[in-house]
A protein has these predicted regions:
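Bacterial N-terminal signal peptides that target proteins for export
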Residues: 1-11
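C-terminal motif of bacterial Sec signal peptides marking the signal peptidase cleavage site
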Residues: 17-20
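Bacterial signal peptide processing site
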Residues: 22-25
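Post-signal peptide N-terminal segment of mature Sec-exported envelope proteins
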Residues: 29-50
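Secretory pathway targeting signatures of secreted, lumenal, and periplasmic proteins
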Residues: 50-103
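Short secondary-structure junctions
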Residues: 53-67, 110-125
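Solvent-exposed, polar/charged alpha-helical surfaces in well-ordered, non-transmembrane soluble domains
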Residues: 54, 58, 102, 106, ...
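Short, well-structured beta-strand
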Residues: 120-194
Length: 194
């Protein structure tokens, strides 16, 4: 009888254990990252070797070209957001201006392949001889904000925002808006030194 009781208890225990695992599971809601950009303050970026200056967020860091370089490109890095604005500078002539403007429009259109809307906003600061266009690419774009600035005679400055990782436009929208506002500040405070 003891073997029979042992088998009965084992069978009963197995049924209890197996039936305890069956139950209604409650799905957990998806959690999304909430990004709270910091309150922004701007500082003047004025590097002696560069032919331009502008205001930049105190939370951004500027990557300069090597000291022995003849180029005037910079990168504006946002390490907290894994984002970077890649900026290039080109000396132009009145004859090459159209070529560079056309290239900027093509680059914006190429980045906007899967984008529903490209919003273009023109900027003009006659006092500082700065004219430009801001491109806002709404939707899934590798570069949601791009811009170009020129004096139409000697200087051409272009920038494009990229994230380090592939992002979902909706999830990263607060950061894109924050950096877009920094770019607008850059454009509005930009001037040529030479």
């Amino acid at each position: 009888m003891t073997i029979r009781k042992a088998i009965s208890y084992s069978f009963l225990s197995a049924i209890i254990i197996l039936s305890s695992c069956i139950g209604n599971s409650t799905p957990k809601p998806k959690g999304f990252l909430r990004i709270e950009p910091p309150e922004v303050q701007y500082v003047l970026f004025n590097e002696n070797e560069l032919p331009y200056t502008f205001s930049v967020s105190q939370y951004a860091t500027i990557e300069l070209p090597p000291a022995d370089s003849a180029t005037y490109w910079i990168n504006i890095d946002y390490p907290e957001f894994d984002a970077k604005i890649y900026c290039s500078y080109i000396n132009i002539t009145a004859g090459t201006l159209d070529e560079h403007v056309e290239e900027c429009f093509k680059l914006a259109e190429r980045a906007a392949r899967n984008v529903a809307v490209i919003t273009k906003k023109s900027y003009e600061n006659k006092d500082n001889n700065v004219y430009g266009t801001l491109f806002l690419l709404e939707g899934e774009s590798p570069s949601p904000v791009q811009f170009m600035l020129t004096d139409s005679a000697m200087h051409f400055f272009r920038g494009a925002l990229y994230y380090k990782y592939k992002t979902n436009a909706d999830s990263i929208a607060p950061v894109t808006e924050y950096i877009k506002n920094d770019i607008v500040e850059l454009i509005q405070t930009f001037y040529w030194k030479k």
